[in-house]
Amino acid sequence: MEIKFTIKQVVAVGIGAALFVVIGMINIPTPVPNTSIQLQYAVQALLSIIFGPIIGLLVGLIGHAIKDSLVGYGLWWTWIIASGLFGLVVGLFRKYVRVINGVFDWKDILIFNLIQLLANALVWGVLAPLGDVVIYQEAAEKVFAQGIVAGIANGVSVAIAGTLLLLAYAGTQTRAGSLKKD
């Protein structure tokens, strides 16, 4: 299977990964060690909905790997992969959110937030901590606490910032059937 990317998709990955890194440097601490409220997942969710699951996956993988490299504590692959999977899962359901058609009403907001909340619960509450236990032999109690807090924090930040970004984006799109011939 050969995957070909358009120039627009390559640019989306590059800009998305760069935004992931820059926004990811803003850390709002939580009471759980090594866990903070992260705002970059709202941008990743936006790009996943607009460009699809592969772009969302790449934005998360590349952006998180670069961010981890820059902050100096090394690459934490289980969480890097979880970031990519978040974008993948959200992007898989893009056809249910109509922002590309210029529509993002209460139904779309509800669907988007159900998708992102489930994706956050899956990747941060299950996959990342499970990977930490299996691969890094981390204490299960510690990493599941981190994962649950990260999942809740990311879910709330994407619900707020991601919804606002998608509302703004939908407003820039022409609604289907809105143009009429005079």
From Swiss-Prot:
Keywords: Cell membrane, Membrane, Transmembrane, Transmembrane helix. InterPro entries: ECF_substrate-spec-like, UPF0397. The chain crosses the membrane at residues 10-30, 46-66, 73-93, 109-129, 148-168. Its main location: membrane. One of its GO terms (cellular component) is plasma membrane. It is found in: Cell membrane. Gene3D superfamilies: 1.10.1760.20. It is a multi-pass membrane protein. Belongs to the UPF0397 family. This is UPF0397 protein SPD_0432. It comes from Streptococcus pneumoniae serotype 2 (strain D39 / NCTC 7466).
